[in-house]
UniProtKB/Swiss-Prot annotation:
Binding site for Zn(2+) 1: 61, 63, 138, 208
Organism lineage: Archaea, Methanobacteriati, Methanobacteriota, Thermococci, Thermococcales
Protein name: Ribonuclease Z
Gene name tied to this protein: rnz
Molecular function terms, GO-annotated: 3'-tRNA processing endoribonuclease activity; zinc ion binding
SUPFAM superfamilies documented for this protein: Metallo-hydrolase/oxidoreductase
Keyword Zinc: yes
Amino acid sequence: MIEVIFLGTGGIKPTPERNVPSIAIKVEGELILFDVGEGTLRQMEIAGLSPMKIRRIFITHFHGDHYLGLPALIQTMNLWKRKEPLHIYGPENSIEFIKNLLNSGYFAPSFDVTVHELPGKARLQFEKYEVWAFEVSHGVPALGYVFKEKDRRGSFDLEKIKNLGLEPGPWMKELEEKKVINIGGRTIRLSEVTGPKKRGAKIVYTGDTEPCENVIQFSRRANLLIHEATYLNSEDRGESYHTTVEEACEIWKKSKAFNLALFHRGPRYSFKEYKEGATKLCPQAMIPRDFDRIMVKGAEYVIFKVR
């Protein structure tokens, strides 16, 4: 089970209703953060999430509302005597920008902070999941991210076991660990006695972007597309390089992702006003508030939990 926790659903600046962007993905006790707007540490405290559980942080771009929460987060980790390395990923110039942040004030972390600059397209492999980076269109170097849970092996198939003249037993645990074993002089492979692989969850986070073909391509058949929708309509669009609700809904439909969540709401809207307007334009979309959670299990289902 993967848990997506919305720590900040607003954009540009905090409002009394919501904080600026940060999304946590919780998988088997590990926390991965996508963007760290100012105040993210406080949001984590309210959500009951420990900064010490964070192993990786992915920054979409270097506008303040997406990264200015980093110093407070890292200094708190240091105060709590963190020893485990922290890995931060982002677009070009990440090393310079984060180095400048860490050099400000009377502070130096006692643990390793490693910054990885990602090209416009990257695929990172970790033990239980992958993260893919792709370029979006925001007027500055900016990335969207795909979180992809690794596919899991299929269940043991008793019919296949029987057809090989075998009976269920302790050898199954050994086979699960080693993938290939020898029974009675015969080589048995795990793939011979299990069913089809179970597809892992796929979650896409766009960060800030105007309508972008890359989002459609990388969101193909995702369980969940988290797309920015700063404006309810094009008449409200002040600056460029952002998306309206209607545009985000159209991108979602083209991508054939199964579920859509809209975030990065402009500060001009109350939640009530935004939800009413967005629901008329895209009735199927989820409109999360800060601290709402979405539970994703494999490729099977998505549950939206309101705080």
